[in-house]
Every structure is written in C-alpha cells, then in structure tokens.
C-alpha cells in the first residue's frame, strides 16, 4: 500500500481527501501508465449512487481525455460489472467510482486492467510516483485533434445476461426472496435478474438518493432484511453493499449466513462436483475458527491470507485455486469472475439451495460459529501502525491471549480503507471476550489519540 492507494483503490472523504484535483490527476496518470503503448485507449467508467460520483466522474473524464483517452460512461453499475465488461468488451482499462460499504460521504476510485483485474502494487506505485512527485512532463498532453471523446454506453443488460449464463438454465420459480440493495448500485441490476429466473422478489432499500447508500441497510446492517424475511415468510434474504462486490444471506428464520458459511457451502458443492481446484478454499485471518474446524472435517484444504480481497485474489492466482473470500461476504469465484461479485455469488448460492432441496437454516449448520467480537478503535490514518510498537498495548494483548489459553485468539488489524484499527477476539465465552475487546479498543484509542 502506498500513500494514495489503500487495499481497494484510492479512498477518502469526497471533496476533502478525494478531491476533483486528485481525480483529474488520477485520470491523467492512470490512463498514461495503463495504456502507454496505445495511441487512443478506450476506458470504461462506472459509478455507484453517492452524491459525489458525478463530480468525481467529471474530473476523471477531464484527466483521461486530456491525454487522448476515449471514455465510455456506463452510469450507475456494480464494481464487478465493470471488471467483467472491461474484458468482455475489449476496453483497455476500467475505472469504478465507489467507496463500497463505506458511508456516503466517502468515495473511492479503483482501476481495472484490460483483463478485468485490480492493479498490482507496482502499477499503483507508478501512478502514485507521477502524481506525488509531479512528473507531469512524462505525461503527454493530447494535440487538439487527439483529445479524447466522452461516450455514454448501456451495458447493464449484457452483464445481466452474463450472470444468468453462469447458472446452466437454473430456475428459481417457487422461491420467495427478499433483496436488500443497500440503496446502491445493485438496485437496478439484482432484482431484475432474480425475477427473470422466476423468483418472487421483495425488494428493500432500492431508492438511492445520493446520501442513503449503506445507511442502516445492506450487508453491513442486516436488521431490516432479517425483519422483512420473517414478516414476508420468505425462503431467505440477500443483502449487498453499495457497489455489490459483497453479499450476505439471511435464512428463513432471520439468522445471518455470513461469508464464511457461504464460501464453505460453495466450496463443498464444488468438491462434490469435482470442480474444487486443488481441493482448496482461500480464506483470510478474519475467518471464524469454526470454519477451520469444519473445513478439516469436510476434507477441504485452507490457504490463509491477510485481510483484503486483493490478497485473496493473489493467492488464488498463485496457487491455481477456484474459490476464496472473506467473512464480510467478498467472495471470488475465479471460474466466473476476476473480482468479488455479490450478485454472482448470491445466484450461485441460490442455485445450490434449490438443488439441495433443503432450507437455508439447515444448510447453515455446515459449521459451528465460535463467539467472535469485532470492535473498532478510531485512530488517524497516519498513526494506525503505531499500535505494534506501543509496549502498553502489546502487554494488554498478551494478557488477553494468556487468558484465552489456546481456546481463542486476538487479532489487531488496521483498516485498509478507513481511519480505524479493528480489534477482533474469538473465544468460548461471549461476555468475556466482548469486555476484553471493548477494553483493548479503548486502550488503543487513548494511547494513539
């Protein structure tokens, strides 16, 4: 991670940290680095529903066209749709304007290469180097007749058809499903796909107004979905985040089915079909201890990475594996997609539920969830790494670990996208670990404030 790029592109409070000036510079430097050899690169841009997206899109377009790139605006669309469409439609690069699951005041800019993959650290460092060290003399200004043009394109239907093509003509007729679109990019895509496949769909949080994306809804706030599933006597519910790169489920009783359970169910299904490459599932250090126990019982190997879907993807490509993901619902199905795709994952799990003939509550028993507590400590971005050098914090962590005595764990992790340090504790006694996590988070805040 550099000074501009975090674990998921460039992110910050819109118009304060992520300014129009920075978006313009990212457009210029990004187009140059990604398409140096192209005279007239074609770049696809998508956005979610935040109020700041139009402003940042305009600045990006100015930067891109000033170096001669032709821009194609896909409008409001999901992040994984951009990744897919860049490759399927032959664009030279793709850009998504979104801060994913973050509140509306944040926004982000992430790039995809011509194959639909997020950028490597080396490419991001090249872009950063130009911007931070003001190496603009390296970046050409297009001559009058070579300035790029801006075009609007309608590609949503192409993406929806692709999603349906991954299901081998499965039918969801007879299913009643509640879908929470998080007032984000899934609103115009997901409900239509499920309805096309025959499901009866009840949609909530699909009225984006620029400021309500992820607000008490979507995959980070499941309460409304849980209530609607029970009230509507639905078979299950599906939640996405603002840009639909992640998904979580709620069973017919209103219980959460998180990313750990979703990817274990999908991995087990692939294994039964002989399609689980190298018999391996890639997970992160945040996955619940129960997943490790269940995977062993199912005969599935686990590869463990740092938190962040970019690290999951690296491990998938490096090892030649087919599935990996995070507890938060970022799941990468490499046979179908180059990035986490919430709608794709939810379609695959719905197909699995249909073929199993079982209720989701029954399927969810695939693993026993160990009590796990996650508490956020608010710490400025520049101070997030100092916790590991603070003797008082380290001593407090050690004491909690000694108390757990091998029957749990403590994980302290600076967020890659927000000014937070996440304190995660797992153990057998929920009340005890909650108290310890709260105390550790308070200590970290007071020591690093």
Swiss-Prot record:
Keywords: Isomerase, Magnesium, Metal-binding, Phosphoprotein. Gene3D superfamilies: Alpha-D-Glucose-1,6-Bisphosphate, subunit A, domain 3, Alpha-D-phosphohexomutase, C-terminal domain. It catalyses: alpha-D-glucosamine 1-phosphate = D-glucosamine 6-phosphate. It comes from the Bacteria. The modification Phosphoserine is found at residue 100. Pfam families: PGM_PMM_I (PF02878), PGM_PMM_II (PF02879), PGM_PMM_III (PF02880), PGM_PMM_IV (PF00408). The keyword Phosphoprotein applies. Its cofactor is Mg(2+). GO terms for cellular component: cytosol. The active site is at 100 (phosphoserine intermediate). Binds 1 Mg(2+) ion per subunit. InterPro entries: A-D-PHexomutase_a/b/a-I, A-D-PHexomutase_a/b/a-I/II/III, A-D-PHexomutase_a/b/a-II, A-D-PHexomutase_a/b/a-III, A-D-PHexomutase_C, A-D-PHexomutase_C_sf, A-D-PHexomutase_CS, Alpha-D-phosphohexomutase_SF. GO terms for biological process: carbohydrate metabolic process; peptidoglycan biosynthetic process; UDP-N-acetylglucosamine biosynthetic process. Belongs to the phosphohexose mutase family. Catalyzes the conversion of glucosamine-6-phosphate to glucosamine-1-phosphate. This is Phosphoglucosamine mutase.
């Amino acid at each position: 991670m550099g000074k501009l790029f975090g674990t998921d592109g460039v992110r910050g409070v819109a118009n304060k940290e992520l300014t129009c000036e920075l978006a313009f510079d990212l457009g210029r430097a990004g187009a140059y680095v990604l398409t140096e050899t192209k005279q007239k690169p074609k770049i696809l841009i998508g956005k979610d529903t935040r109020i700041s997206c139009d402003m940042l899109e305009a600045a990006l377009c100015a930067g891109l066209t000033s170096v001669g790139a032709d821009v194609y605006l896909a409008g409001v669309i999901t992040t994984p749709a951009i990744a897919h469409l860049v490759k399927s439609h032959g664009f030279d690069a793709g850009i998504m304007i979104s801060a994913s699951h973050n509140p509306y005041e944040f926004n982000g800019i992430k790039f995809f290469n011509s194959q639909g993959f997020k950028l490597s650290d080396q490419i991001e460092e090249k872009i950063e180097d130009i911007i931070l060290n003001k190496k603009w003399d390296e970046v050409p200004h297009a001559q009058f007749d070579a300035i790029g043009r801006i075009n609007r394109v309608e590609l949503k239907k192409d993406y929806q058809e692709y999603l349906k093509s991954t299901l081998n003509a499965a039918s969801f007729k007879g299913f009643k499903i509640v879908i929470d679109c998080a007032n984000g990019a899934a609103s115009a895509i997901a409900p239509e796909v499920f309805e096309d496949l025959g499901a009866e769909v009840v949609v909530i949080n699909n009225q984006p107004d620029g400021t309500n994306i992820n607000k008490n809804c979507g995959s980070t706030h499941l309460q409304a979905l849980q209530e609607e599933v029970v009230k509507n006597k639905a078979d299950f519910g599906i939640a996405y985040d603002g840009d639909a790169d992640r998904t979580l489920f709620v069973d017919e009783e209103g219980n959460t089915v998180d990313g750990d359970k979703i990817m274990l169910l999908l991995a087990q299904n692939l294994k039964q079909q002989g399609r689980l490459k190298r018999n391996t599932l890639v997970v992160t250090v945040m996955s619940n201890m129960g997943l490790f126990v269940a995977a062993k019982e199912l005969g599935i190997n686990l590869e463990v990475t740092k938190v962040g879907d970019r690290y999951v993807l690296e491990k998938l490509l490096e090892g030649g594996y087919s599935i990996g993901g995070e507890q938060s619902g970022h799941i990468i199905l490499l046979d179908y997609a180059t990035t986490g795709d919430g709608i794709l994952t939810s379609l695959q799990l719905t197909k699995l539920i249909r073929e199993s003939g079982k209720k989701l509550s029954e399927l969810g028993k695939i693993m026993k969830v160990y009590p796990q507590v996650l508490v956020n400590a608010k710490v400025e971005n520049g101070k997030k790494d100092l916790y590991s050098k603070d003797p008082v914090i380290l001593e407090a962590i050690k004491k909690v670990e000694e108390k757990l005595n091998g029957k749990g764990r403590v994980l302290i992790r600076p967020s890659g996208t927000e000014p937070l340090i996440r304190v995660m504790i797992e153990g057998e006694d929920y009340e005890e670990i909650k108290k310890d996590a709260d105390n550790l988070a308070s200590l970290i805040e007071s020591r690093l404030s």
